[in-house]
């Protein structure tokens, strides 16, 4: 493989801002991220080694060239699928370990937020019915506590950001949305699609059993709110970055969200 050659650029880049390449460095395959965010660079410099020691497996930092703003990190060779996230107990276990760590006063974190303006921007793009739109506005008004939390969170725990090392260790990568916030933000992406309230209850129950604290129904409601926020985030990011898959995602949301909002309204808004 030639150094610097892109491998499935569309898949590797996903929706992040950095340009990502799989390259060969000193005879070893590594991930090269060009123009990574300050948040992700700081994560690998400050947290990667500690997290791996604690059993929160993340890619190892190989090198950061601050002159070129190029980050080299461990390549995790084996992908996992969506179903795996709910089949393997290590996923929840590692998230619990992460969430139990306190943030530092000098930490560099992504600022997650959900504003009325962002909601309206996404809804204008989606062109959903008035009832569905009102449901999203109502959830936004109930969401402030998701972003006031004192837990460290990945901020982007979807299936595409998990992989396995050759030795079988489960690794969570892509830390440009590393932040503080509610654990529901990391639990919502574990559920395929929009999911149902029963799905949220199951994940909440497993998480609380592992963390040994919390209330299942309350956490399930927060997962539902987080799901709605992620829709707003994804729609606005897709449009702003002119992602080639935008129309596919928008079509799916338009087909799915009205029924999802209708079925979830009673449980989440109660």
Question: What do these predicted ranges mean?
Answer:
Residues 78-113, 129-136:
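Conserved kinase catalytic-core helix
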Residues 89, 171, 188-191:
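Glycine-rich, phosphate-binding/catalytic loops in enzymes
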Residues 67-84, 120, 228-247:
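A glycine-centered beta->alpha junction motif in the catalytic cores
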């Amino acid at each position: 493989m030639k150094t610097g050659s892109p491998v499935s650029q569309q898949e590797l880049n996903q929706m992040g801002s950095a340009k990502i390449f799989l390259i060969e460095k000193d005879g070893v395959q590594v991930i090269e991220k060009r123009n990574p965010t300050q948040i992700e660079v700081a994560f690998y410099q400050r947290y990667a080694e500690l997290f791996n020691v604690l059993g929160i497996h993340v890619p190892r930092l190989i090198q950061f060239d601050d002159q070129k703003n190029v980050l080299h990190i461990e390549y995790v060779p084996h992908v996992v699928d969506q179903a795996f996230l709910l089949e393997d107990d290590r996923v929840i276990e590692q998230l619990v370990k992460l969430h139990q760590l306190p943030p530092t006063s000098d930490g560099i974190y992504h600022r997650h937020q959900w504003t009325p303006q962002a909601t309206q921007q996404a809804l204008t793009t989606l062109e959903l019915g008035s009832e569905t739109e009102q449901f999203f506005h109502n959830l936004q008004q109930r969401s402030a506590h998701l972003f006031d939390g004192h837990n460290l969170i990945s901020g982007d725990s979807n299936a595409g950001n998990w992989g396995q090392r050759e030795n079988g260790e489960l690794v969570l990568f892509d830390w440009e949305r590393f932040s503080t916030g509610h654990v529901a933000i990391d639990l919502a992406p574990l559920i395929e699609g929009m999911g149902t309230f029963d799905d949220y209850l199951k994940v909440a129950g497993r998480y609380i059993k592992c963390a040994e604290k919390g209330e299942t129904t309350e956490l399930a409601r927060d997962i539902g709110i987080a799901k709605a926020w992620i829709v707003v985030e994804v729609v606005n990011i897709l449009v702003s970055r002119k992602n080639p898959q935008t129309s596919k995602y928008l079509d799916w949301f338009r087909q799915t969200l009205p029924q999802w909002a209708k079925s979830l309204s009673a449980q989440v808004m109660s």
